[in-house]
Amino acid sequence: INGGRYTSQSTSLCINTTANSTTNIHGGTFEGKGTVICNRGKMTIDETKGKTEIRVAGNQTDLPRSGVRTESNAITDIASATIENAQYGIWNKENASSVTLKDAAFKDNENDVYLEAGQYITIEDTFTDTATVKVADSPIATPRQITTADATGQEKLNLVSNDKDAEGKTYFVAYDAVNNYRYLTPRTGYTVDAENAKATVDGTTVLDKVTQVPVGTPVTLTADQAPVGQEFAGWAGI
């Protein structure tokens, strides 16, 4: 598919593939009221022939509203697309390592990524935006792995959990440096992500956005060297 507009007038699928099929979407607008694209074969989604927009129309509640859903032994490779107005932007229903996200623009979704129990997603470091993640596990047993260990730069991903624990606290998306994947864990403190500076504890441990700091922990901030001709004016908190 190299462009065009494709619309489902009912809650039926706009694009519905079968097992052992191969589908390449290189551009086009795809719109439906329920699940827009359901893949059971091998699918590549990119924008090599034009912009690719996957949009859920309306806000009906009688069935799930998803942008791209993967089932069975499907392999889904999302290199570039805009996914919007979905309850589940990318829904990995089956096959734990079946979805690879290289890049996408998420817009007005309730959950950008939705993972059924025991499912993961591969997110490459070419994805630099923020994505919200929700899992179907009930209850959630932590640590709950959410990304595979197949891609580099997992510690740099901007992932936010849309799940809460029994106390109403949103789970923290931590990083397993040994096994190279992101996982959900209870929130026990705060994170310090210093920009143009270094944040340390006890003068040795460097903090980043995947490291929690217990409440009350003294943190030392050290500004980076100012560019030539400029001076350090002060700190700004966000």
Where are these regions (language model features)?
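N-terminal capping/linker segments that flank leucine-rich repeat
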Residues: 168-187
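Hydrophobic residues embedded in beta-strands of well-ordered beta-sheets
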Residues: 23, 43, 76, 179-182
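Beta-strand-rich solenoid/repeat architectures in extracellular/passenger domains
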Residues: 1-13, 22, 26-36, 46-65, ...
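A short, solvent-exposed beta-strand micro-motif common in secreted/extracellular proteins
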Residues: 45, 78, 101, 217-226
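Surface-exposed interfaces of beta-sheet-rich extracellular modules
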Residues: 147-174, 218-238
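Hydrophobic beta-strand core residues of beta-sandwich domains
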Residues: 17, 39, 70, 92-95, ...
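Tight coil/turn sites that cap or link beta-strands
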Residues: 20, 40-42, 48, 73, ...
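Secondary-structure capping and domain/repeat boundary segments
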Residues: 186-238
